[in-house]
Amino acid sequence: MRFGLLAALIATPLAAAPVAQGPANVPSFKPAFPNQTRAEAVKTRTPLKITEVATGLDTPWGLAFLPDGRMLVSEKQASALRIVSPNGAKSARLTGTPPTDTRGQGGMFDVALSPDYATSGTIFWSYAESRTGGTGLAVARGRLVTGAAPRVENVRVIFRMMPTLDSIQHYGARLVFARDGTLFVTMGERSILPGRVQAQNLKSDLGKIARINPDGSVPKNNPFVGKAGVRPEIWSYGHRNVEAAALDAGGRLWEVEMGPRGGDELNRPEAGKDYGWPTIGYGEEYSGLRVGKGLTQAKGMEQPVYYWDPVIAPSGLAIYSGKAIPEWKGNFFIGGLASTALVRLVLRDDRVVGEERLLTERGDRIRDVVEGPDGALYLLTDDSSGKILRVGPAKP
């Protein structure tokens, strides 16, 4: 009898341990399919080197590489853009950008280069805008002028998230250019209850991902174009606060969004689909009460590809395509604010099969993750004297 039990135990493969993390806030919530949460822990085999490229940035939020290898960086609290050289030298703050509202979670957010930047010099940025009755997310474009007096010229606001709301939280604000030249804009639901419920309201931009043309007009093939009572810029809806988004090798959009207490999500937003917030989710209110009816599934609402409980507080996403670290090919790298980690996900057939937490020993809140032209990852740390970190192989 004992021999039979021992043989059975030997024959049964043990479940691999997940990444070390705290207990779930809502242990009664169960995943909808295997590996939807707490996937097997994996470990990068390539020895890594972490280099501080630049320091002294005022709460940096977004980063984009210029063709010459310099970096365009936003400073959230300073409401400014800077150009940072590979040696860490910082330009003066660019002039010409509109004023921002820096209260709460507001300020200067993401930056992106136009697909035709090499000829047009056009850049895009998102920011919190003061308005009558509250605030909202805005997206502007202009021509970048470098040199001794760096500035932005011909500035034009091309998009404003509507409606205006008396809130200083959950702006979203990531900018991602699609392969066809259209621009994805992520928009938070503003956190407070009057905004949260609008994530399911197609007359509102709150809690949505928008898809617009570079001039701010709406693409004719957006999913809700021509439908009465619906904002035509909407691509997908039912989102909470998306501060991480990127395209994969096939040009598909992925996003990682913040949950409440538990329930951060990885999603692949498709045209016209509903991602559930606040009707379904895998977290609870900060008070410990359930969100709505406490549902994790509902008809017509998409399941997250992956979720975290406890949260990582995701901000910034890069999907690795470089050659510097071959074992990372196709892996997802997510900035973790609350988790103070660079979170690595290994996917197979659009399902997560492994997770790793990198840089945890540093204790940095990571705000953005960008793959550089050299195949290294460049990170922004979220503090009043923020850094640009380079994560690359120890041996070039």
Feature-to-residue mapping (PLM):
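Gram-negative bacterial Sec-dependent N-terminal signal peptides
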Residues: F3-A15
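Internal metal/ion-chelating core segments
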Residues: L175, T182-G195, A199-S236
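Acidic, Gly/Ser/Thr-rich repeat motifs that build Ca2+-stabilized beta-propeller blades
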Residues: A17-L193, A244-L247, R252-E255, G259, ...
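Repeat-solenoid scaffold signature
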Residues: V230-E270
